[in-house]
Amino acid sequence: MVDYQGKKVVIIGLGLTGLSCVDFFIARGVTPRVMDTRINPPGLDQLPESVEQHVGDLNQEWLLDADLIVVSPGMALAHPALSEAAEAGVEIIGDIELFCRENQAPVVAITGSNGKSTVTTLVGEMAKAAGWSVGGGGNIGVPALTLLKQDNQLTVLELSSFQLETTHSLRASAATILNVTEDHTDRYPLGLQQYRAAKLRVYENAKVCVVNADDALTMPVRGADSRCISFGVDVGDYHLNKQQGEIWLRVRGEKVLNTREMKLSGRHNYTNALAALALADAVGIPRASSLKALTTFSGLPHRFQLVLERHGVRWINDSKATNVGSTEAALDGLQVDGTLHLLLGGDGKSADFSGLTHFLQGDRIKVYCFGRDGGQLAALRPDVSQLTETMAQAMALVAKVVLPGDRVLLSPACASLDQFRSFEHRGNEFARLAEELG
């Protein structure tokens, strides 16, 4: 526990997380100041009257006068105003650090470029199936500080690289980096290793590290050690096993579940299940409860979600695929009876799309590209690609040629904000248009 009495605290960034920080300090007898670069940030009208606010930009005078700055993950630490405050000796942390200083419950910490939300939710479902009281949140759903108010036996946190940058006191009972693929190049100008270094912070002081045997970038800097348990497709303590056309989850050579019994589909989801099982085992959730959860969990919206099956055509919403690695995961091992109609596009965040080319081969694929970086994506395989301005135009083209046995997959490999409010908005539009056109 840390005593914040008498500290001058500034919170940067409102919304649910910012408000949870305000509540945290007021409950401890400290009235913070709040600022947000947005003119009308969400939650502004919910601030207590006693809290000073500054919107539209950063108030440098407040920052330099502070003892402690709690910064939103959306604000880069490299911002000149924050750099100046840090050089002046002001402590800069995030809400996850505040949580870790106070939390008493065991923590499962999950990060990675792709699959975080699915694995976080799965581990929570496994704990619930065992009758445990569990709180889940962080980068998904409930702000971490809200979880402090609950008396849980286990806390499962999804953590982004941005959140980990400002966290120093995390001591996870089990932690994982699911994978590391290029993302957020705008925030990590030094490249993939800088991004990876932020992710690796999740292993600091962790009792058990769950690593991806197929991705060396998920290993601790000094390599695997006695804390490490691995999962992977063909190798790892937890791995997949194909026998007579069926795929099993195996743990150290023992078959534990036939994937036919799972509602999740796709190889990337089977490895997500392995990671969740490894984490659950590490914190003592009974195996039978975990396996039961795997047979009932049907996945999260916008993550390889079947939204329509009509006239023999399956329409799949994978709008959460906001980077190249996530789309590669969706395409890896994907089997389609007919033709795959793949929708790509949006804001690529300066990413290198060339890795997708490998997955766009063959004559049973058609690619429909839209949005800000649609042209770059269409150039990967111009002979099978069509370029439109919007996703709706692309789907109208798909509807004219789709046949029974085909699959329509929105897995854009890009952020959505060039044309949509969020990846959820994009996914909901895809589902609406599928229903209309399918």
UniProtKB/Swiss-Prot annotation:
One of its GO terms (molecular function) is UDP-N-acetylmuramoylalanine-D-glutamate ligase activity. Pathway: Cell wall biogenesis; peptidoglycan biosynthesis. One of its GO terms (biological process) is peptidoglycan biosynthetic process. It is an enzyme of class 6 (ligase). Keywords: ATP-binding, Cell cycle, Cell division, Cell shape, Cell wall biogenesis/degradation, Cytoplasm, Ligase, Nucleotide-binding, Peptidoglycan synthesis. SUPFAM superfamilies: MurCD N-terminal domain, MurD-like peptide ligases, catalytic domain, MurD-like peptide ligases, peptide-binding domain. The keyword Cell cycle applies. Its main location: cytoplasm. One of its GO terms (cellular component) is cytoplasm. ATP binds at residues 112-118. The keyword Nucleotide-binding applies. It is found in: Cytoplasm. Pfam families: Mur_ligase_C, Mur_ligase_M, MurD-like_N. It catalyses: UDP-N-acetyl-alpha-D-muramoyl-L-alanine + D-glutamate + ATP = UDP-N-acetyl-alpha-D-muramoyl-L-alanyl-D-glutamate + ADP + phosphate + H(+). Its EC number is 6.3.2.9. Cell wall formation. Catalyzes the addition of glutamate to the nucleotide precursor UDP-N-acetylmuramoyl-L-alanine (UMA). Belongs to the MurCDEF family. NCBIfam families: murD. This is UDP-N-acetylmuramoylalanine--D-glutamate ligase.
